[in-house]
Amino acid sequence: MSDINATRLPFVFVASPPCVGDDIAMVLTRGENLC
């Protein structure tokens, strides 16, 4: 996991539940919400 994704993880968890699990990194990269 890149440092950029690691930095954005807390923001994503606050914005929406971690329903995608480890795939959250891919969501950050694509800018899409799989929820």
UniProtKB/Swiss-Prot annotation:
Calcium among keywords: no
Tissues expressing the protein: Expressed in basidiocarps.
A GO molecular-function annotation: toxin activity
Record has Phosphoprotein as a keyword: no
Cross-link Cyclopeptide (Phe-Pro) per UniProt, renumbered positions: 11-18
Domain of life of the source: Eukaryota
Keywords of the record: Toxin
Prosegment residue ranges: 1-10, 19-35
Posttranslational modification: Processed by the macrocyclase-peptidase enzyme POPB to yield a toxic cyclic octapeptide. POPB first removes 10 residues from the N-terminus. Conformational trapping of the remaining peptide forces the enzyme to release this intermediate rather than proceed to macrocyclization. The enzyme rebinds the remaining peptide in a different conformation and catalyzes macrocyclization of the N-terminal 8 residues.
Task performed by this protein: Probable toxin that belongs to the MSDIN-like toxin family responsible for a large number of food poisoning cases and deaths.
Family: Belongs to the MSDIN fungal toxin family.
Entry protein name: MSDIN-like toxin proprotein 8
Species this chain originates from: Amanita exitialis (Guangzhou destroying angel)
